[in-house]
Design a protein with these regions (language model features):
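Active-site-proximal, substrate-binding regions of enzyme catalytic domains
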Residues: 1-106, 118-180
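Short acidic/polar active-site loop segments enriched in Thr and Asp
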Residues: 109
Length: 180
């Protein structure tokens, strides 16, 4: 699978030292747009930036710049996707808009985000007929369990680690209910 990442999920998984889950599950590519790296993470994730940059340099995360999109002859498509998604999802969270737009443009088919507000991209992508499947960090952990990569105990332990490191106050039971 291929995935485009939103800002918060990057921060949550890196703070818990569980970023490797992304590379294991999305073995065909993990992608971020340059603005998520240069603006969003610079402002909200300075504590994990060195690790993210290391993974970009190691080729674990593919960073898409405007120039790279132009070289692939898809920059105008990306711009159109950004414009449409800003209207659909409110320009308040550009990280989400960029992550969705990148997924649409390059055919990533998976969006990993932790923004599950009503009317937001996660809920809309689940309810409407889109080619992109949204996942939260909890969804990724549950998928990893269902694929037999880890057992239930490890899944719960990892959920609690991310939940506590990022002070999310999420309930694992409610995340399982949403997943089902």
């Amino acid at each position: 699978m291929r995935a485009s990442l939103d800002t918060n999920v990057i921060i949550h998984l890196y703070r818990a030292e569980l970023q490797g889950i992304l590379f294991d599950l999305f073995d065909e590519g993990v992608f971020i747009y340059e603005q998520i790296r240069s603006m969003e993470l610079e402002h909200h994730g300075q504590d994990i930036l060195t690790k993210v940059d290391s993974d970009i340099n190691a080729g674990k995360i593919e960073l898409f710049t405007d120039q790279k999109l132009k070289d692939l002859a898809v920059y105008k498509m990306f711009e159109n996707n950004v414009r449409e998604n800003r209207i659909l999802y409110n320009a308040g969270d550009l990280g989400e808009v960029y992550a969705i737009s990148l997924a649409q443009t390059i055919g990533a088919y998976s969006l990993v985000t932790d923004d599950t507000k009503q009317g937001g991209p996660y809920m809309s992508l689940l309810q409407l007929d889109y080619d992109i499947m949204p996942f939260t960090f909890a969804d990724v952990l549950i998928l990893r369990y269902l694929m037999g990569i880890v057992d239930a105990e490890q899944t719960v332990e990892d959920f609690e680690l991310v939940n506590n490191q990022s002070q999310l106050n999420w309930s694992f039971r409610s995340q399982i209910s949403k997943f089902i």
